[in-house]
């Protein structure tokens, strides 16, 4: 039996709502419904009664519940034990491409410099979209997530690392927003609400990317402008702030599982400033 089906069953039984279960599992509501139908077809019984928004376990569902919990707990324990034997000296850090390029690459270098030679700690720098990394963290496939928005989930702990400043940059001086094409750089799911007030409502980006370096390299060719971290842009050189634009401050968070077995290591690593001179 697919453990993902049991996981979905447990989440629906906990929330009694397909929409909320979908949000918790980072799935669409139709995918959750499909998984429940698959499980019901495999077992040959209905697991839930559905009357509008009133979702309840059937008698068969009530009987399955303790077995599903036991199976999932056993599976999680097995995964954790197997993973521990193969990666006890490994530590995975996940973030978007832009965060790695603009600030985390330097932080990783400082971490290596501060490591004791005998520690044998091996880092994995993982690049992906925030939603994918949150799912990996939830499933214990990732140790630490660095992001601009803290997930609103009880099983996560977070630490505010500080703030960094974004400004709207282009490749030549004294340019206005109306003269430039917009290159959208993804700075987190809540950035769009800030972006809307700083960019014309009808502005359609000619390029959308998660890489600050790619956006920077395309500014001249596309006669464009993009939101870039001020310190990083100054280090790169050759960039100019758009004349009629403002600046924007963004938070940076470290996120980890509350019951992470690497909590002590996480605390030690976060003693090294991530936003060095940002």
Swiss-Prot record:
Signal peptide extent: none
PROSITE patterns: HTH_LYSR
DNA-binding span(s): 18-37
Domain HTH lysR-type: start-end pairs: 1-58
One family name in Pfam for this protein: LysR_substrate
Gene3D superfamilies noted in UniProt: Winged helix-like DNA-binding domain superfamily/Winged helix DNA-binding domain
Superkingdom in the source lineage: Bacteria
SUPFAM superfamilies listed in its UniProt record: Periplasmic binding protein-like II, Winged helix' DNA-binding domain
Keywords associated with the record: DNA-binding, Repressor, Transcription, Transcription regulation
Keyword Cytoplasm included in the entry's annotation: no
GO molecular function annotations of the record: DNA binding; DNA-binding transcription factor activity
Similarity annotation: Belongs to the LysR transcriptional regulatory family.
Function: Negatively regulates the transcription of the flagellar master operon flhDC by binding to the upstream region of the operon.
Protein name: HTH-type transcriptional regulator HdfR
Source species of the chain: Salmonella typhimurium (strain LT2 / SGSC1412 / ATCC 700720)
